[in-house]
Amino acid sequence: MPSTPESDPTQPGDRPARPALRPLTPVEGRVLGVLVEKQHTVPDTYPLSLNALASGCNQKTARAPVMNVSEAEILEAIDGLKSLSLVFEGSSSRVPRFEHNMQRALGIPSQSVALLALLLLRGPQTAAELRLNTARLHSFADISSVEAFLDELASQTPPRVVRLPRAPGARENRWMHLLSGEAGAAVAAEESARNTDGDAAPSAELEQLRTEQQALAEKVARLQGLVEHMAAQLGISADEFLG
């Protein structure tokens, strides 16, 4: 029998249909992804203050696209996410702090939450890239495990992710989230079509570039985690620490 989201199952299972959410705005998607990420990478400072949330939304690494949003825009996004029960504001601190409610609101396990967060933060990725990039949020046993949770998200009503057509020279399909609605899927489909019209790069060269990119991303993620931990110990944001 399927487990409830709170039981954090290790394997996906069939789940009842959930009410369709309105499409998220780009800033709402970024805020939601950051809250999920920081819950795992800087648990000592989670739930996040507005300042920490702004720092996470605007950080230059592990983000695609890089954004530059104001605190006013973030507060507007938080209000929108609150109306969808995706974000709560804590009441136990004089400084407002915010936490996500993605697992309960969407009725999905934490593994799926991690995958959606990385798709929100970094855009379309292959299952292999997602396994690497979610390492600090959840350790998937293998790529097949990642694909199983992605397949479940894709089969939900409404679907939460979609598998994109394979790009020229690529060995794997990329996945993208559908939390921003069908419009986001259309943009990704057009991008894929443009790639298909171009000259295909040699498979070996493309695979080498992907390998190097993944290795670099892993190093950057480790460094980012170290910076965030040190900044948290000093009681400042990561940007202030680096500045």
Curated annotation (Swiss-Prot):
Domain of life: Bacteria
Stretch list, region Disordered: 1-23
Name of the molecule in the record: UPF0502 protein RALTA_B0914
Similarity comment text for this entry: Belongs to the UPF0502 family.
Extent of Polar residues compositional bias: 1-10
Entry-linked InterPro entries: DUF480, WH-like_DNA-bd_sf, WH_DNA-bd_sf
